[in-house]
Amino acid sequence: MIKKVPIVLSIFCFLLLLSSSHGSIPEAFLNCISNKFSLDVSILNILHVPSNSSYDSVLKSTIQNPRFLKSPKPLAIITPVLHSHVQSAVICTKQAGLQIRIRSGGADYEGLSYRSEVPFILLDLQNLRSISVDIEDNSAWVESGATIGEFYHEIAQNSPVHAFPAGVSSSVGIGGHLSSGGFGTLLRKYGLAADNIIDAKIVDARGRILDRESMGEDLFWAIRGGGGASFGVIVSWKVKLVKVPPMVTVFILSKTYEEGGLDLLHKWQYIEHKLPEDLFLAVSIMDDSSSGNKTLMAGFMSLFLGKTEDLLKVMAENFPQLGLKKEDCLEMNWIDAAMYFSGHPIGESRSVLKNRESHLPKTCVSIKSDFIQEPQSMDALEKLWKFCREEENSPIILMLPLGGMMSKISESEIPFPYRKDVIYSMIYEIVWNCEDDESSEEYIDGLGRLEELMTPYVKQPRGSWFSTRNLYTGKNKGPGTTYSKAKEWGFRYFNNNFKKLALIKGQVDPENFFYYEQSIPPLHLQVEL
């Protein structure tokens, strides 16, 4: 008992100092935290307030989009190291009448995981990043604060023929990636990352830790691509690992307009979704100014689950116009291919995947997306190419093939609905130097003009990846925003699954504690239809 006295005094003095120094932090929150951590010295290291030397570094550590560095800051940041810390954070934030924001990797394009227009507590999960791989069971448990790179590295340490169908950006947090769907180069073979979730642990609005069995199948359905932060704090996930061959083949082949790049892109639309599932063939349109002059390129990027000789046969049979040659191809194992598509130089140590900060320069970015149901005309593609060529700051266009496994999964299997009727998706991205603050709106307006340009050529109503959410699409006006109002943006991400998400939200979080600008609103059928 005597040994506990210094600990209790240390915690008491720490919290007393907080209450006297930060009148903006509600006393109810500090009192609750004091009670929850009365004998837990870890509070000294996991609670960060503006007067702490650690506050700014923790806040900025995983802000991937510097557009929001000047946004209103949280009253406090909690960086839990135990699941019980998450429970305490949820209970105390709710009791104090504050909002909570949940951040795993900070890659949210709108910064919604770490900013708010009203006073809030930031729950940063970066210290919850344990990974346990079970090769015999073809599964793994991974905590939400781990990055895609850390997860890939751990899989490769255990097996050269196992993988997971997640994205290519190694610094993205697993929590946000899985709960928003998660697409990558294996989606035609194995579907989305969220299609391969088999269990999860969530802290709900009542502070309870629930697994798949105790949360029930409805909530488990919702968090697999429906935006986990609308329903609770998912602290860990159990996922299914997939098989890959010992060697895969990759290539990136770029063509200018004069080299037939646009004609090849037009042809690609007719074959990409019909190719064998083992072949992922995406296309980008972007400015290659390495020569000093603005030059648009159509870049064909591929991952093939097999060897070069087999890939050449598939391409000769399905897309001979591209003219792929053996010397264009590189053979490597899957983990090195993941590094290749993440932008790491060939031969770089795999240990760089464990670096939580992106190896790429941080730039301001805004993004939108569409799903395409039928090939676009040459006229539409000509207008798109012309727009990209004439814009002073050319957007990046990424076209991702669907088909394969994506066409075999029901549109209601998980919240992500865009399956058999979609042949590919288009992602529009504008990137600029963050020091050019005065031109930010101009760049964002340019993205809006591009979206408007594509409107006649895109099936209506439009659909978008939830992971590319954009507040210009629409947003909640407060925790009282109704389902009928939220449909204006919600159907774009989830189509007819949006109503089911709202009904589940009404069951598990009727008071809408887990609210943010594009969270799922609770739908109570007896009140609102």
UniProtKB/Swiss-Prot annotation:
Query: What is the annotated signal peptide range for this record?
Result: 1-23
Subcellular location per the Swiss-Prot or TrEMBL entry: Endoplasmic reticulum; Vacuole; Vesicle
Kindly give the PROSITE patterns that the UniProt entry links to this protein.
FAD_PCMH (PS51387)
Biological process terms from the Gene Ontology for this record are: alkaloid metabolic process
**What is the annotated tissue distribution of the protein whose record heads this document?**
Expressed in leaf epidermis.
Residue ranges of every copy of the FAD-binding PCMH-type domain listed in the record: 70-244
Record-linked Pfam families: BBE, FAD_binding_4
PANTHER family in the record = OS08G0158400 PROTEIN
* Protein name in UniProt: O-acetylstemmadenine oxidase
Per the UniProt entry, what species is this protein from, by scientific name?
A: Catharanthus roseus (Madagascar periwinkle)
